[in-house]
Structures are given as structure tokens and as C-alpha cells.
């Protein structure tokens, strides 16, 4: 047990050195998504995130900024945190954004990240051997919703690499929905 604690502490220390602090020189935060959604400032959200996505193609720092804004794992700079933690109320705000801007890649990416978070909550962030059959079933259902939202995000903006990254990462853990596998192998779906 003591050895496990030392190993975990060493891993946390290593991760902390990889992720620089969010100081004045390095701002990972792009926008207060929940606040702007509550105020229905959809154009501002889309403008900020579209600009960040565009910048991510030409700058490693901008790529990190965009990645950390959307990546929840062990990340204090995650723009979506309070929105996904709000549960159904957070999802309702995202759905309002989608209704107002159905071609917004980031409105769909927000939903993908919402379902991604839910899938991992059901799966549990601990060891997989602690995950019950019921938890796996719920996680798979959330993952399927995540895949659908991520594909919509990519349909709106084919260069939407964060949605592709979510699908790729989760396929290793949850697999892919059967209908997607059939589609990818050329079956009529």
C-alpha cells in the first residue's frame, strides 16, 4: 500500500511538471462556457472557439490551449467542468446552443464532452475490475451518445480534431457502436 502511494505521488508529480501552471504567460482558458450559455451569447462562444481551433493548426502552444480547454482528464484548465458537473441542466444549456446554432462544431463538441464525462463516470475512473456489468452498459450507452455528437461536430467542421481524438480514445476503452463499425466496413446502415 505504501509503495502504491509513492507510485501515485510520483505520477502526480510527473504530470504536474508536464502541465504548466495557468499563469499570466500561459492562459489555457478560452471561455466561460456555462456563463456564456446562460446569457445565450452563442456567437461569442463560436467565435472564441473557432478562432482557437484555427490557431491550433499553426501553433503548438495554441494546440495545447485548445486541447486543455476540452480535455477533462486531470486538468484544472478544463473549460467544460462546471457544465458537465451540472448534469441535465448543463446538457439543457448545450442543447439550447445547438438549437440556436445547429452548424456549430463546438456546440456538438460540448455535447460530445458531456457524454464522454458521463461514460467515464459510469465506467469509473478507477480500475476497470471495479466496474460492474450495469456500469459498463451505462458507460457504453453514454459513449454511443458521445460518438453521435462527435460525428456531428466533425460534420460541421471536418478539421475538428478534438472530436476525432475523443472517439479514438474511447474506442480503446468502450469499443465502437455496432452501427458505426458496420458503416465503416461499408455495410448499408
Task: Write out the residue ranges for each language-model feature.
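Membrane-embedded glycan transfer/ligation machinery
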Residues: 109
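Short coil/linker segments at helix-helix boundaries
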Residues: 17, 24-39, 43-103, 113-189
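Non-catalytic protein-protein interaction scaffold segments in large eukaryotic complex-forming proteins
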Residues: 1-29
Amino acid at each position: 500500500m505504501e509503495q502504491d502511494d509513492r507510485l501515485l505521488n510520483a505520477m502526480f508529480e510527473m504530470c504536474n511538471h508536464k502541465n504548466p501552471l495557468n499563469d499570466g504567460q500561459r492562459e489555457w482558458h478560452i471561455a466561460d462556457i456555462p456563463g456564456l450559455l446562460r446569457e445565450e451569447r452563442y456567437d461569442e462562444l463560436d467565435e472564441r472557439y473557432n478562432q482557437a481551433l484555427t490557431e491550433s493548426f499553426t501553433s503548438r502552444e495554441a494546440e495545447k490551449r485548445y486541447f486543455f480547454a476540452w480535455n477533462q482528464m486531470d486538468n484544472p484548465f478544463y473549460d467544460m467542468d462546471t457544465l458537465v458537473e451540472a448534469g441535465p441542466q448543463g446538457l439543457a444549456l448545450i442543447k439550447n446552443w445547438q438549437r440556436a446554432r445547429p452548424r456549430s462544431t463546438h456546440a456538438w463538441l460540448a455535447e460530445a464532452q458531456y457524454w464522454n464525462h458521463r461514460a467515464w463516470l459510469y465506467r469509473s475512473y478507477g480500475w476497470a475490475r471495479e466496474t460492474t456489468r450495469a456500469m459498463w452498459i451505462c458507460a457504453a450507452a453514454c459513449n454511443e451518445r458521445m460518438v453521435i455528437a462527435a460525428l456531428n461536430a466533425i460534420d460541421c467542421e471536418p478539421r475538428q480534431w478534438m472530436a476525432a481524438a475523443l472517439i479514438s480514445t474511447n474506442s480503446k476503452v468502450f469499443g465502437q457502436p455496432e452501427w458505426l463499425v458496420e458503416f465503416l466496413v461499408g455495410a448499408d446502415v
